[in-house]
Swiss-Prot record:
Source domain of life: Eukaryota
The UniProt record lists the keyword Coiled coil: yes
Origin organism lineage: Eukaryota, Fungi, Dikarya, Ascomycota, Pezizomycotina
Principal location listed in the UniProt entry: cytoplasm
Lipid bilayer topology: Peripheral membrane protein
Protein name, entry field: Autophagy-related protein 28
Residue span of region Disordered: 1-148, 221-245, 475-494, 546-612
Coiled coil feature spans: 283-350, 485-514
Organism: Gibberella zeae (strain ATCC MYA-4620 / CBS 123657 / FGSC 9075 / NRRL 31084 / PH-1) (Wheat head blight fungus)
Annotated localization: Cytoplasm; Vacuole membrane; Cytoplasmic vesicle membrane
Function field: Required for the autophagic degradation of peroxisomes called pexophagy, but not essential for general autophagy. Involved in resistance to elevated pH.
GO biological process, one term: autophagy
Cytoplasm recorded as keyword: yes
């Protein structure tokens, strides 16, 4: 079940306080056969009367606990599903609710006192609001045990698991991309690895396999019960290999999913920061209020210029003077005694008024002390899991090692917790969350910039492949002369040099910003272009330029990409859980919004992938129109086109 929301936690303090006071009634031990169970009557959820027991025979002693447990969602579903069918045609449902808890009933009968304790702990485990009565009010007198165990927020580990899953998907897509590019640059030019269309052989194999599965047995298994309950059937896993086009699209989608995950984590971080800042502000407000009250109280007690204090001192002096006058003047004894009686009454009145004024401050100070003590016993914020935010034991900043963590604060006895400890705890968590938020913003910016770079790379590749494909079509049609075609192919070589230079610039940009994901992807595209260029140069019989082949930047970037891929492959092989290494996605790229279906980039990609294997004219049809040299040249040009399409 999901944790209660902020509004649910704020709006239900009475219900949360009243639940621990109510313990379920003790159920007598009863044992019966499970075959005698049947669904509840149709009006369990809507009648005001208590539900009947689930046994066919009359049972006199049925506890409220078993009655509540029998009202499971499965029983509600079966009740509504079979409510319209006649009772004589209703068959026994597949699942009519859980059986009565025999073993747990015996344990609860042996330990009746533990039920209330467990229920109170379970109620305390729910979410707390910042202004709930259980946090800042007085606790219930019947709640004797306080659960001091730290409860961590599980959303951070959930986000971490989702991020690791996306990283594994990205690693698989990178492996598929490398496999597709290697297969496209291999000797077998007619290999269709990674193509989006299936061959006749694979179709026949899948058809034969499906027929063998269907005809394995003459007995057809039951798909559903007579009442309409569908029996689930395990579906086979699709073994169809993904093509290079789908791999690139998958990389784009994975980057978009990773960007959405970062946005969600940023939202949770903002919420956590706001909660802790509110708690810290409330704590500062209470501390300031208490300090103001006590400072004013001490100032009033020690103020010699206070009117009531001065009046009290003057009356005391007058009383002493009157006592002396009584001793000296016996004739004035009657008047002096009367005056003394009046002065004493006046003193008592002044003392009472003064104490009444100071008692209000003392009561307010005691209330604040009680509220702060309650806040220290049950803090409104769950401890922050520093490890789930990406800080391991070795990568944790030095300042995080010195701060007081929430788990350490909650492990202390409540009477030993102080306001300074709570302030140190929340200030440290706020600093950690702010650092994580800054890192998330930096990662999102890197993802946006990297996605733009990848879009430029795919656009360059698609534009060049479209031009090369048009040239191959014109050469295979046989309408143009050989010399203009030779010049066009040489111009394609120069354009290929430009594309290689642009890819090298993008690769250098990715290396300068340590974008390992783009280094792998762009390096693979660059290597494919270099191989295609070499093949095209050999076809035309032109010497390959030394700058393009022996470029140190290209060799360094290619070696670096290959070394990174080999290290990542070795690390992923050594790890038992097949996780993506942490340094592969140091700067994770966030994909921009998906292009519309009619955008130039998607059209170029679709054109490059969709027309790669369908618009090629077989060499045999050109044997009558061209000589042997022309056929050989067209064959090699078609091989270059297929290599670029891979």
């Amino acid at each position: 079940m999901s944790s209660p929301s902020m509004f649910d936690r704020i709006s239900s303090p009475r219900q949360r306080l009243s639940n621990p006071l109510r313990s379920p009634p003790i159920r007598e031990v009863s044992e019966y056969d499970l075959d005698e169970l049947e669904p509840r009557s149709d009006d369990v959820l809507f009648d005001q009367e208590p539900p009947l027991p689930r046994l066919k025979k009359n049972m006199q002693h049925v506890s409220a606990t078993s009655t509540r447990r029998s009202s499971s969602p499965a029983s509600w579903d079966s009740k509504h599903r079979y409510s319209n069918s006649p009772p004589h045609t209703r068959s026994k449902p597949i699942f009519a609710g859980p059986p009565p808890p025999i073993a747990s009933s015996m344990m609860m009968n042996q330990h009746p006192s533990r039920q209330s304790t467990v229920s109170s702990h379970g109620d305390n485990g729910r979410g707390y609001g910042l202004i709930s009565a259980s946090r800042f009010g007085s606790n219930s007198p019947s709640q004797k045990h306080v659960d001091n165990r730290p409860r961590l927020d599980s959303i951070w580990r959930s986000l971490q698991r989702r991020e690791k899953a996306l990283e594994r998907d990205i690693q698989q897509l990178l492996d598929l991309q490398a496999s597709g590019l290697i297969a496209g640059s291999g000797e077998g030019s007619e290999s269709n690895f990674g193509s989006d269309t299936t061959t006749g052989e694979s179709t026949f194999y899948s058809t034969a396999t499906s027929k063998s599965r269907m005809m394995n047995s003459l007995h057809m298994p039951t798909r559903s019960t007579p009442d309409g309950n569908v029996i689930p059937v395990r579906q086979p896993v699709s073994n169809k290999p993904r093509g290079l086009k789908s791999t690139r699209v998958g990389l784009q989608r994975s980057m978009a999913a990773l960007s959405d995950l970062k946005a969600e984590e940023d939202l949770h971080l903002s919420t956590a920061l706001e909660q802790r800042k509110d708690a810290l502000a409330y704590l500062d407000k209470m501390s300031k209020r208490r300090d103001d009250i006590y400072s004013e109280l001490h100032a009033l007690e020690d103020d010699e210029e206070e009117p009531l204090g001065q009046e009290l001192r003057s009356l005391e002096a007058e009383r002493q003077e009157l006592d002396h006058d009584i001793q000296r003047l016996e004739e004035k004894l009657a008047g002096a005694k009367k005056r003394r009686r009046w002065v004493r009454e006046k003193m008592e009145d002044v003392k009472g008024r003064r104490e009444a004024g100071l008692s209000g401050y003392r009561a307010a100070g005691r209330d604040v002390d009680i509220e702060v003590r309650t806040l220290m016993q049950t803090p409104p914020i769950a401890p922050l899991d520093i490890d789930a935010l990406g800080y391991g034991e070795n990568t944790r900043p030095k300042e995080n090692m010195d701060i007081l963590r929430g788990t350490e604060f909650l492990q202390l006895r409540p009477e030993r917790r102080t306001v300074e400890m709570a302030r140190t705890w929340w200030q440290g968590e706020i600093a950690a969350l702010e650092r994580r938020k800054a890192q998330i913003s930096q990662d999102r910016q890197a993802l946006i910039e990297g996605s733009e770079v990848w879009s430029d790379v795919t656009g360059l590749v698609a534009q060049f492949e479209a031009k090369l494909r048009e040239l191959v079509k014109s050469s295979q049609a046989g309408d143009a002369d050989e010399e203009p075609q030779q010049a066009a192919m040489q111009s394609q070589l120069s354009e290929m040099d430009d594309v290689v230079q642009e890819l090298q610039k993008r690769l250098q940009l990715a290396e300068s910003k340590h974008w390992n994901l783009l280094i792998c992807a762009i390096g693979a595209e660059l290597e494919a272009f270099v191989e295609a260029k070499a093949l095209l140069s050999d076809t035309l019989g032109l010497p390959e330029p030394a700058a393009a082949v022996d470029s140190p930047e290209l060799s360094d970037s290619t070696d670096k990409a290959e070394g990174t891929s080999q290290e990542e492959r070795a690390d992923s092989h050594d790890e038992s859980d097949n996780e993506v290494p942490a340094d592969l996605l140091v700067s994770r790229m966030e994909d921009h919004d998906h292009d519309p279906p009619d955008s130039p980039q998607q059209q170029s990609v679709v054109l490059r992938r969709g027309s790669a294997g369908n618009n090629e004219v077989p060499v045999e049809f050109l044997a009558d129109l061209h000589g042997p040299n022309k056929i050989e040249q067209d064959t090699e040009i078609a091989a270059v086109t297929r290599l670029m399409s891979k």
